C-alpha cells in the first residue's frame, strides 16, 4: 500500500490523539513541528493539514503545511538521531513506507535509517528523527485525507 499525493491529517499510531502540527501556525523559519491534539478551529486547523507532493519518478515526497505554507525540514539539515523537525521554506525530502499494517506508515529520511518519531504523548512534544525501530509504534503514522475529515 502506498500514499497518494494529496492533503492529510497525520496521526501518530502510538499516541492516537496527537497529530503532526506546525506550532501555533507560525510561518517563521525554524518553528518546531510537534505532536498536538486535533485543533479544529478556523485559525488553527491548517497547521495540522499536510500536503504531500511526490517528486517525479521517485517514491520521495515533500510535506507542506496548508496554513502557513511551511515545509517539514530537519533543523539545520542535521540528519542525526534526535534532530528536531521544523517549518521552513526549504523541504527535507522524505520517503513514506507502509509498515505492513493496514493504513500505518513510517516517514523516513531516504537511505539514512532515520524516521519521524514522537517521543511522548505530552501535548506539544517536538517530533524528532529517531533510529528506525521496527517494533516502535511511536514511529508509525496514520494518514487521513482531509476530504474525509
From Swiss-Prot:
Disulfide bonding pattern of the chain: none
Its biological purpose: Lectin specific for terminal, non-reducing N-acetylgalactosamine (Gal-NAc)-containing carbohydrates including N,N'-diacetyllactosediamine/LDN (GalNAcbeta1-4GlcNAc, LacdiNAc). Specific also for carbohydrates containing N-acetylglucosamine (-GlcNAc) or N-acetyllactosamine (-Galbeta1-4GlcNAc) at the reducing end. Agglutinates human blood group A, AB, B and O erythrocytes with a strong preference for group A. Agglutinates bovine erythrocytes with a very low specificity. Binds carbohydrates bivalently, which is required for its biological activity.
Stated name of the protein: Ricin B-like lectin
Quaternary structure, from the entry: Homodimer.
Biotechnology remark: Potential for use as natural insecticide.
pH-dependent activity: Optimum pH is 6-6.5. Retains more than 70% of the maximum agglutinating activity over the pH range 5-9.
N-acetylserine, modified sites: 2
Temperature dependence: Unchanged hemagglutinating activity after 30 minutes incubation at temperatures up to 50 degrees Celsius, then at higher temperatures activity decreases. 14% of the initial activity is retained even after heating at 100 degrees Celsius.
Keywords: Acetylation, Lectin
Superkingdom of origin organism: Eukaryota
Free-text comment about domains: Contains a single ricin B lectin domain with a characteristic beta-trefoil fold consisting of three repeated subdomains each containing a more or less conserved QXW motif.
InterPro entries: Ricin_B-like_lectins
Gene3D superfamilies in UniProt: 2.80.10.50
GO molecular function: carbohydrate binding; protein homodimerization activity
Region entry Involved in dimerization, spans: 110-112
PTMs per UniProt: The N-terminus is blocked.
Consequence of substituting residue 55 to R: No effect on sugar-binding, but loss of dimerization, hemagglutination of human group A erythrocytes and toxicity to Jurkat leukemia cells
Residues noted as binding a carbohydrate in the record, renumbered to the chain: 21, 24, 39, 47
Amino acid at each position: 500500500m502506498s500514499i497518494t499525493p494529496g492533503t492529510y491529517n497525520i496521526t501518530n499510531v502510538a499516541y492516537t490523539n496527537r497529530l503532526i502540527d506546525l506550532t501555533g501556525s507560525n510561518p517563521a523559519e525554524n518553528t518546531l513541528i510537534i505532536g498536538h491534539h486535533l485543533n479544529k478551529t478556523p485559525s488553527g486547523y491548517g497547521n495540522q493539514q499536510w500536503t504531500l507532493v511526490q517528486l517525479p519518478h521517485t517514491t520521495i515526497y515533500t510535506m507542506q503545511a496548508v496554513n502557513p505554507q511551511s515545509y517539514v525540514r530537519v533543523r539545520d539539515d542535521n540528519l542525526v538521531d534526535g534532530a528536531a523537525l521544523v517549518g521552513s521554506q526549504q523541504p527535507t525530502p522524505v520517503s513514506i513506507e507502509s509498515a505492513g499494517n493496514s493504513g500505518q506508515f513510517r516517514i523516513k529520511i531516504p537511505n539514512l535509517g532515520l524516521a519521524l518519531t514522537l517521543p511522548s504523548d505530552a501535548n506539544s512534544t517536538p517530533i524528532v528523527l529517531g533510529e528506525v525501530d521496527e517494533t516502535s509504534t511511536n514511529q508509525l503514522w496514520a494518514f487521513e485525507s482531509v476530504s474525509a475529515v
